[in-house]
Amino acid sequence: MYVKGRCSNMWRQISERLEDYPGRQKVARALVELGLSVREGTKIYCGGIELSDVKIARHLAVDRRTVRDTAQLISADPVLKSVFERIRPAGPFLADAAKFLGYSVIEIYADSHTVGIVAQAAALIAQENIAIRQAVADDPDLTPEPKLTLVVEKEPSGTILQKMLKIPGVKKISTY
């Protein structure tokens, strides 16, 4: 989201508004990472399922009031409210179950500011006539070592992996 006169990075906007409250920052970060929304005042949802403040607090090792206060602050701030009432979970992450589904996983670690890595990696995979079942990119503002995770229908050749390593900005690749 871009707000004129402010940085365009979503996490920086959230962080600025919560900078005096580390516990609330922790809660807000978890809401973003897990795709949890704040709607209907101060209720926290995973998709259409309302979640308990107590269980969220327990998971994050914070007081339940910190969870409630975070939701109240989000609801009272027009920018935060507009972001958090629209966040949704991204769906299942297949990488951990890939081998049981007959898929392979390619993890690409790269400079997060380099443009075109997803497109170039997808083009190389398509050259081998391999379908991509899922692509998930970590947010570099939320993850210390962000990566692009590709779940593919079959194991890619070593040649394709070597070509991926030559994509500008790519630091390393792992497969499983």
Spell out what each predicted region is.
Residues 56-57:
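Short alpha-helical "recognition helix" segments of helix-turn-helix
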Residues 2-5, 11-33, 38-43, 73-176:
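A conserved regulatory-domain signal marking ACT and ACT-like small-molecule sensing domains
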Residues 46-47:
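Gly/Ser-centered flexible loop/linker motifs
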Residues 53:
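Helix-turn-helix DNA-binding elements, focusing on the entry/boundary residues of the two helices
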